[in-house]
């Protein structure tokens, strides 16, 4: 599953996954929690998009449901430019060599909503969607690896520029802060492949509950007793460390961040806003992060 056939490493495809759909935080605003501002005109999900761009992702998949995707799409658009290729100084025609990174918006499948739609499941759902869609088009579009950026972890996305080669390699890559990674439940970027996907998904399938009590079966097949309401579909409340605790850090590239803030609660968000590190987060140049759309087939967009 999610393991493309062997092909030339020059065709390595890194897909970025930004999980948004999940259990709500305690901000209680009318808009999605991922749209909390980090700086003037700069939101948490936009920082994640820039992080994926600096990491070298060829595509970006934002996992969000239809009730919030229009506003997120209004902020971000359908593409972002690769910051490494955008303003190359020694390129005689830099505008012609710019690389666009398409952005796709993926809703959680209706059968999974209110059943196992935690933030960790959004990561896995984004990866499997990227794989299935790419495989239907061409084997060259199936991702080799997936890079995950969480809107609720704040650090400088530009730091990923120095690790692009490590991220787009066969070795796993993890960001860490004070020796803690995604395996400890922190919102830190990391990569995974098809084998990791199966291992993470197994946690949700085996440890998550359904509607029926599997401890009492008739003919060892049929459940006849329902679980109490509060115990049904427990996977929707699974934390990141529960799902990704099996992350294999041995032989992986682990990069220690100079600073990092968790903003998954109002208290943590206030700590970031009151810290000196907030001045290190600012909206990139308009040419890099701006609402853009792909031209429809057969139509000219004169505005661009």
Task: Put a short name on every predicted segment.
Residues 137-145, 153-258, 300, 304:
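Conserved core of the sugar-phosphate nucleotidyltransferase
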Residues 248, 254-304:
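C-terminal catalytic/acceptor-binding lobe
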